[in-house]
Amino acid sequence: MTAAVTENNGAGSDSSVAGRVVRVIGPVVDVEFPRGAIPELFNALHAEITLPSVAKTLTLEVAQHLGDNLVRTVSMQPTDGLIRGTSVSDTGKPISVPVGDVVKGHVFNALGDCLDAPGTGRDGEQWGIHRKPPAFDQLEGKTEILETGIKVIDLLTPYVKGGKIGLFGGAGVGKTVLIQEMITRIAREFSGTSVFAGVGERTREGTDLHLEMEEMGVLQDTALVFGQMDEPPGTRMRVALSALTMAEYFRDVQGQDVLLFIDNIFRFTQAGSEVSTLLGRMPSAVGYQPTLADEMGELQERITSTRGRSITSLQAIYVPADDYTDPAPATTFAHLDATTELSRPISQMGIYPAVDPLTSTSRILEPGIVGAEHFRVANEVKRILQKYKELQDIIAILGMDELQEEDKVLVGRARRLQKFLGQNFIVAEKFTGEPGSVVPLRDTIEAFDRICKGEFDHLPEQAFNSCGGLDDVEAAAKKIAGK
């Protein structure tokens, strides 16, 4: 972080005002500055430290003004080797990251340092990560569907172009795989730009994602920004803002429609809780920071559509102990346009993506936006699945034979619908040996309408498993019949 950077939104120039470290407690560092030279909140400070093996520059972000010429900062790197009396310089601007085409195909950390090709982007344009959301008169008023080619999403929980989508679910139900699939589909089908923020997740997952995207040929259209779980809380708290800043440049300067993926937004909240405790704030509900709603709002309000261009955000949200009343996921709910809940029971049935069709929601699933036919078919699918859910207790206790004839027909139809909601993913081809399917929305609506009307009640249930369209179902049925 020794290269000089510029920033296009009035962050100021490098003032190089020197202070000195007076206290170090883990990642929290108190710095004393000369009278009248106190750095502004969120300014980046640099401290040079020398370890036995290497000299390095620490980046500290100003979090509090304590009075008596003292500021409390949060370090973005481990503070090993930092001692009292170390000289600290004020850069006069916030943490800044490279923006533009130079970031595509590369991996960055929260400070904007390129990890796979050191030095990349530091000679070009830089934007500070703390920015205001777009003005009200710049927001896009039109609502448009983002067609994904994934049947269960397009039909029952349609995504809003320029909206915020939450992927809810416990550990191991497929949140990261669904995000990888969306990145692949956006790059292949729409030639769109994606920015991925890895917030507090496993380093192994980040490495796997990078290698898989390179293998799939979509890395050149994606910027990756990582602050993984082995990093200090300051980094994990800021990495989402760094990725969002890169996405904002593509939207505001290049006029592109961008997809921003955040995995995992819960770790953003968790890092904020750690920082809040380190700064001495009184904890709020369930031990979370009292500023939880404010911090979440600062991030989410910048993710929006402006006139003619958009940032659509897909956010994986870990739900602690599958408790949806936990303040972290509950606070995120208020900002979302659509929620996709991944269900463990559906995952255990071998149906992927394991989206729960009854609890997943979308604010645009109404006739005035998606159309009367789409709305009618989606509601009919939900009605049949809901009735099947109500009958499951009776089936478990008394068996299918005790049901009325019309209920037996409905149960069979519901099971076919349930299996048909799954489909093969492009990113899973090497595991399943089956090609991934992309189903147009028009075909999805027609297929589910025909299944709901009973046109395929004569086909075996297993023929519907992980199929793309009705042609795949009929082919699978013939294959089963031939055995």
Curated annotation (Swiss-Prot):
Q: List the disulfide bonds.
A: none
What keywords are assigned to this protein?
ATP synthesis, ATP-binding, Cell membrane, CF(1), Hydrogen ion transport, Ion transport, Membrane, Nucleotide-binding, Translocase, Transport
Q: How does it sit in the membrane?
A: Peripheral membrane protein
Which top-level group of life is the source organism from? Bacteria
Q: Name one GO cellular component term.
A: proton-transporting ATP synthase complex
Predominant subcellular localization, coarse grouping: membrane
Q: Which Gene3D superfamilies match?
A: 2.40.10.170, Bovine Mitochondrial F1-atpase, Atp Synthase Beta Chain, Chain D, domain 3 (1.10.1140.10), P-loop containing nucleotide triphosphate hydrolases (3.40.50.300)
Q: Which HAMAP family match?
A: ATP_synth_beta_bact
Subunit composition and interactions:
F-type ATPases have 2 components, CF(1) - the catalytic core - and CF(0) - the membrane proton channel. CF(1) has five subunits: alpha(3), beta(3), gamma(1), delta(1), epsilon(1). CF(0) has three main subunits: a(1), b(2) and c(9-12). The alpha and beta chains form an alternating ring which encloses part of the gamma chain. CF(1) is attached to CF(0) by a central stalk formed by the gamma and epsilon chains, while a peripheral stalk is formed by the delta and b chains.
Q: Which residues are involved in binding ATP?
A: 169-176
For this chain, the family text in UniProt reads: Belongs to the ATPase alpha/beta chains family.
Q: Where in the cell is it found?
A: Cell membrane
Which named protein is this? Answer: ATP synthase subunit beta
The membrane spanning regions, by residue number, are none
What single Pfam family name could you report for this chain, choosing any that match? Answer: ATP-synt_ab
As recorded in UniProt, coiled-coil segments are: none
Q: Which GO terms describe its molecular function?
A: ATP binding; ATP hydrolysis activity; proton-transporting ATP synthase activity, rotational mechanism
The cross-references to SUPFAM superfamilies, in alphabetical order and at most eight, read: C-terminal domain of alpha and beta subunits of F1 ATP synthase, N-terminal domain of alpha and beta subunits of F1 ATP synthase, P-loop containing nucleoside triphosphate hydrolases
Q: What is its EC number?
A: 7.1.2.2
**Source organism (scientific name):** Rhodococcus opacus (strain B4)
Reactions mediated catalytically? ATP + H2O + 4 H(+)(in) = ADP + phosphate + 5 H(+)(out)
Role, per record: Produces ATP from ADP in the presence of a proton gradient across the membrane. The catalytic sites are hosted primarily by the beta subunits.
